[in-house]
From Swiss-Prot:
<feature type="binding site">
    <location>
        <position position="60"/>
    </location>
    <ligand>
        <name>Mg(2+)</name>
    </ligand>
</feature>
<keyword id="KW-0493">Microtubule</keyword>
<keyword id="KW-0460">Magnesium</keyword>
<feature type="binding site">
    <location>
        <position position="133"/>
    </location>
    <ligand>
        <name>GTP</name>
    </ligand>
</feature>
<dbReference type="Pfam" id="PF00091">
    <property type="entry name" value="Tubulin"/>
</dbReference>
<dbReference type="GO" id="GO:0003924">
    <property type="term" value="F:GTPase activity"/>
</dbReference>
<keyword id="KW-0547">Nucleotide-binding</keyword>
<feature type="binding site">
    <location>
        <position position="217"/>
    </location>
    <ligand>
        <name>GTP</name>
    </ligand>
</feature>
<dbReference type="InterPro" id="IPR023123">
    <property type="entry name" value="Tubulin_C"/>
</dbReference>
<dbReference type="InterPro" id="IPR018316">
    <property type="entry name" value="Tubulin/FtsZ_2-layer-sand-dom"/>
</dbReference>
<dbReference type="InterPro" id="IPR002453">
    <property type="entry name" value="Beta_tubulin"/>
</dbReference>
<dbReference type="GO" id="GO:0005737">
    <property type="term" value="C:cytoplasm"/>
</dbReference>
<keyword id="KW-0963">Cytoplasm</keyword>
<feature type="binding site">
    <location>
        <position position="2"/>
    </location>
    <ligand>
        <name>GTP</name>
    </ligand>
</feature>
<feature type="binding site">
    <location>
        <position position="129"/>
    </location>
    <ligand>
        <name>GTP</name>
    </ligand>
</feature>
<dbReference type="GO" id="GO:0005874">
    <property type="term" value="C:microtubule"/>
</dbReference>
<feature type="binding site">
    <location>
        <position position="195"/>
    </location>
    <ligand>
        <name>GTP</name>
    </ligand>
</feature>
Amino acid sequence: GQCGNQIGSKFWEVVCDEHGIDPTGRYVGNSDLQLERVNVYYNEASCGRFVPRAILMDLEPGTMDSVRTGPYGQIFRPDNFVFGQSGAGNNWAKGHYTEGAELIDSVLDVVRKEAENCDCLQGFQVCHSLGGGTGSGMGTLLISKIREEYPDRMMLTFSVFPSPKVSDTVVEPYNATLSVHQLVENADECMVLDNEALYDICFRTLKLTTPSFGDLNHLISATMSGVTCCLRFPGQLNSDLRKLAVNLIPFPRLHFFMVGFAPLTSRGSQQYRALTVPELTQQMWDSKNMMCAADPRHGRYLTASAMFRGKMSTKEVDEQMINVQNKNSSYFVEWIPNNVKSSVCDIAPRGLSMASTFIGNSTSIQEMFRRVSEQFTAMFRRKAFLHWYTGEGMDEMEFTEAESNMNDLVSEYQQYQDATADEEGEYEDEEEEEPEHGYE
């Protein structure tokens, strides 16, 4: 959809830059490290050009035309642009059942072609938004089809949730709830983003007066690049999508993560400022740094993972991370010991001496789902706008199921937020009075 293609093309600009690949696909870099694992994200064509392993899909041609005419438009394989003409009109049912269903087979053909080109396919990365029609409806359709065909491969999504204050469409709560219903069942890891949190970062931290979607996507692409840098560069402590999942997901349904990035600098002012590991760590765990509108201080971390980039001492990284956990022990569940993992990748992003990306599985993410659910219920009680969905062949039952699935998700998060280290409730009452053990 529009959002996913814009974020995705931004991500490829960043990755091309990090690997020294110019807009025509030629290598113009200066370090062997850039080429060592370039094949993870690129296919090498016969004439030595590097072609991204990327597929762009949309139900209308507009956004993809602008990607094609954009700075890196010529680098993508022309066959990998798959689009319809009709648009989904912000309607999940159109994306999932009618318009999207007509286009999905041609998308899957391209997916198969790309998958066959891989020596060892690790998984799929999907960028989409949940508020519109294409990214939410057709995006989740694609995810479920890929899940059918490649059941044992990782499915990682970067999902832009509707924001509490910034709304584009009145039916966002419907589209988002129907999508979450799908993501809970079919995705392995979801990085939750939302525009409002990104706007706040732009205003507060980056001091931008009028942030554009370009600035927001710049933030997202920095995070995406950080999440994937371990796949793309050698490092002292490597990580991949599967290791990430194993370390972050204690219960299969709870795979919605908050992400953060440090150091945050605006596009214009990425000066080479000296950074230290303690500074990075502090900024990375700061709640103002989270790219979704949920406050980690309102919940507890089940697990978290930090990816540091640049030349630094792993010992210092470990010390800082332990330090964070000891100082804020009440924000971590005590029944998962050692629940923060860190990895280090030797290559820093362009223009920075070191950087870090944060991924946290926090129970406070339920705030996002709660908010969407309240808006959903307010409209669904009155059956407002439902005819747009039933007209495409959907049943009200599906709405009810999606609503209860999302409410179940919220209560699961709440249940683990309240859980203590002790077994079944018998000791819980005495437990509350005593100070926590081990943190005195």
